[in-house]
Amino acid sequence: MKELNFSSLKKLEIILDGEHRGFATDLLDRAGVKGYTIINNLSGKGSHGFHEGHVMFNEDDVLIMIIAAVPPALVEPILEGFAPFYSKHSGVVFISDIQVTRLVKFAD
C-alpha cells in the first residue's frame, strides 16, 4: 500500500445569507481559491435568534455555508475582504487547521 502524504491547510466555513453567495464566491475566486463547496438551506441559532432552513420561494432567502480549504497565506486576505461585508451583514467565518491527502487539488 502506498504511504499517504498529508499537507496542512486551513478550512474556512463561511456562513451568510444566500443572497450574498455571488459576493462570497467572487471574493474567493479573486483570492485564488481553487474550489469550494456550497451547502444550502442551513438551520441554526445565532445572535439573531433561530433560523429555520427552508426553500419556499428562492435560494436567496436561506442561509448558506461555503467550505473552502486554502493555504494559510490566503486566510488573512480573504478575511480582510469579508471585514467590510460583515460590518453590515450577519454571518461568520470559522477557521480550522486541517490535513489533506491530495494537495494537488488545492495547489497552482
Indicate where each model-derived feature is located:
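Positively charged, small/polar-rich N-terminal and surface patches that mediate targeting and assembly
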Residues: 1-108
